[in-house]
Amino acid sequence: MISSFHRPTVARVNLQAIKENVASVQKHIPLGVKTYAVVKADAYGHGAVQVSKALLPQVDGYCVSNLDEALQLRQAGIDKEILILGVLLPNELELAVANAITVTIASLDWIALARLEKKECQGLKVHVKVDSGMGRIGLRSSKEVNLLIDSLKELGADVEGIFTHFATADEADDTKFNQQLQFFKKLIAGLEDKPRLVHASNSATSIWHSDTIFNAVRLGIVSYGLNPSGSDLSLPFPLQEALSLESSLVHVKMISAGDTVGYGATYTAKKSEYVGTVPIGYADGWTRNMQGFSVLVDGQFCEIIGRVSMDQLTIRLPKAYPLGTKVTLIGSNQQKNISTTDIANYRNTINYEVLCLLSDRIPRIY
């Protein structure tokens, strides 16, 4: 999907806010802890290359989801460590080694496949993934991890790190969190040759469980100024939301009582009213279920009426505004504000998803 530069819909990304958010977390965690910036999924929709370059002086490395995301950063000139958090199969090893990309290995089956395909790991840097209770990928015992580490070393790999991921670090009830933490600590204690880096702290753990940090953290959603819990838990320090989303009115008209708006004729005017059309729709990640939500025009909340279309939505206006009038979908407009979390709450989802769904069709302005 190409970026649509010839329409007024844009996402503005404040790189300085991202830098300050990361600095706030770094002040909050113990000294000497390494910081990895999580820039997977195009830095949660903010632009992986631009964010990575902005954070280059502040962080020790980056985390991405897959090899393609890692290669994008390398090709952009990012020379610090890049860790792929997902599983990379052995047939892609040569490309990872050639580009000095660190991979995650999460099972003994991976070793069996590498041997079957006669893959050597000379020059490969590895972090071992432990499943402490998330239930996705990872090993479950010290015995398995010891065997994996020995096998990787036989194949020539440098086992630099070991890590896990907490399922409930952003919840008030820390029962599951503590179970996972103790599981991971016990597993680490049973290792014959512990890797140099041990990390379990995502954004939520770094904020609310900073006393449990090992020697590295992975900062994702908090870097972009959002509360990992949505609004369930209070933040110990302020954050600046880094992305705003805006467009403009491209059509304004008056409709009469009884007129309908949008697909399915789901909205019927009860009286004469002004309606404005905004060029953003579900193809941009502004989903169909946003009917009834309000955006900002001239410092006033204006309700989305009718179904959101693929490319456009319609809003009820308090008066006739000129074409080109600014419409704020995320961010501030004359002292009033719409946050990504507000949108997530309306959709009954999480703020992460709202950002990640914003498509490439929306240009990012820095």
From Swiss-Prot:
The keyword Isomerase applies. It holds the Pfam family Ala_racemase_C. Substrate binds at residues 136, 310. Pathway: Amino-acid biosynthesis; D-alanine biosynthesis; D-alanine from L-alanine: step 1/1. GO terms for molecular function: alanine racemase activity; pyridoxal phosphate binding. The active site is at residues 40, 263. The modification N6-(pyridoxal phosphate)lysine is found at residue 40. It catalyses: L-alanine = D-alanine. Its cofactor is pyridoxal 5'-phosphate. Keywords: Isomerase, Pyridoxal phosphate. One of its GO terms (biological process) is D-alanine biosynthetic process. PROSITE patterns: ALANINE_RACEMASE. Coiled coil: none annotated. One of its GO terms (cellular component) is cytosol. InterPro entries: Ala_racemase, Ala_racemase/Decarboxylase_C, Ala_racemase_C, Ala_racemase_N, Ala_racemase_pyridoxalP-BS, PLP-binding_barrel. Its EC number is 5.1.1.1. Belongs to the alanine racemase family. PANTHER family: ALANINE RACEMASE, ALANINE RACEMASE, CATABOLIC-RELATED. Catalyzes the interconversion of L-alanine and D-alanine. May also act on other amino acids. NCBIfam families: alr (TIGR00492). This is Alanine racemase. It comes from Streptococcus pyogenes serotype M1. The lineage of its organism: Bacteria, Bacillati, Bacillota, Bacilli, Lactobacillales.
